[in-house]
Amino acid sequence: MSKIYTKAQFWKCALQVNPASYLAYRGQEQSLTEDEYNRLPLQACKDENIKVLDIADHGNVDGIDAIRNVMNPEGILVFPGFEIATTEKAHFVCLFSENTSKDQLNRYLGAL
């Protein structure tokens, strides 16, 4: 998305997409490889003309780079992030700029 837009522009988005590792958070085992899993949301994005998605897992950012490497070459912008929960069981999805590195996300998580 390197074009400069001078008027309102809307993109179809998929928000809070979970990475392959999400099932481990739920205590389940993933039957697909990470690459196989990442190709499923890629195909869904292509089928539905989705141009933007965010990737968020519970306190884990390990799957960010792998899904970016699949989505970005196809012109799909990925906002990386993570989900956190409070002691009151409120959940927050924290999203960051598309250029935020996995290391920076880990620093944010470590500061919480």
Task: Mark where each language-model region is.
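Divalent metal-dependent hydrolysis catalytic cores, especially in the metallo-beta-lactamase
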Residues: 41-58, 83
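Acidic/histidine-rich helix-loop elements
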Residues: 19-35
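Extended substrate/RNA-proximal surfaces in nucleic-acid metabolism proteins
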Residues: 2-4, 10, 66-112
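Extended charged low-complexity segments that act as oligomerization/scaffolding linkers
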Residues: 9-11, 28-30, 38-45, 60, ...
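Generic recognition of flexible, low-complexity loop/linker segments
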Residues: 1-2, 42
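Histidine-centered catalytic micro-motifs
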Residues: 11-22, 58
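Hydrophobic faces of well-ordered beta-strands that scaffold small-molecule active sites
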Residues: 13-15, 53-55, 78-82
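Active-site-proximal flexible loops/turns
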Residues: 23-25, 64, 90
